[in-house]
A protein has these predicted regions:
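Structural beta-alpha unit
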Residues: 1-5, 80-115, 152-153
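Small/aliphatic-rich secondary-structure junction motif
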Residues: 2-58, 81-83, 87-90, 140, ...
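Short, structured motif recognition centered on aromatic/hydrophobic residues
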Residues: 11-12, 30, 38-40, 74-75, ...
């Protein structure tokens, strides 16, 4: 059994799908046991830079801002639910291209102690054995990674 307090900062990665949310109860239990901070991490992937000018010209910038605001509200809603359970929770929203790379950079830069993520997400199967985000994160971070399958939730 792990010593209490081993994990101080725990990240759960979310992509807005119900699949990714299935990792939350596992992360919350570990955070509660360790009295750790739980960080809800979402990477927002904007349109590719080569299309950004076209999007702005087409008047889509407002729609992108609305989408970003919806994501923020989604994360804040989850944070508030978890705070109601007496957990120390914060939200981290990163904007950029290269989801796995951005997740790894954040985890390594912030000295995260544990990563909890689902093997399924918005793209369907995470292709764990074939180079999906979960595998890239496992290979790119120093922290242990707990993978949650949908049927484990």
């Amino acid at each position: 059994m792990a010593e209490q307090g081993r994990y101080k900062k725990i990240v759960v990665t979310l992509d807005g799908s119900g699949w990714s949310e299935r990792a939350i109860p596992h992360a919350a239990d570990i955070a509660r046991y360790n009295n750790a901070e739980l960080i809800l991490l979402h990477v927002f992937r904007p349109p590719a830079h080569e299309f950004a000018d076209q999007v702005a010209l087409a008047g889509q910038e407002d729609q992108l801002n609305q989408l970003l605001e919806q994501i923020k509200q989604y994360l804040i809603g989850l944070r508030n639910q978890l705070r109601d359970e007496q957990l120390n929770v914060r939200v981290q929203l990163i904007e950029g291209i290269g989801v796995a790379h951005l997740i790894c950079d954040y985890i390594n830069d912030q000295d995260i102690d544990l990563v909890v993520m689902s093997t399924h997400g918005r793209t369907g199967l995470a292709r764990f054995l074939f180079g999906g985000v979960a595998q890239k994160v496992m290979q790119g971070v120093r922290a242990p990674v707990l993978l949650v399958r949908p049927d484990d939730a």
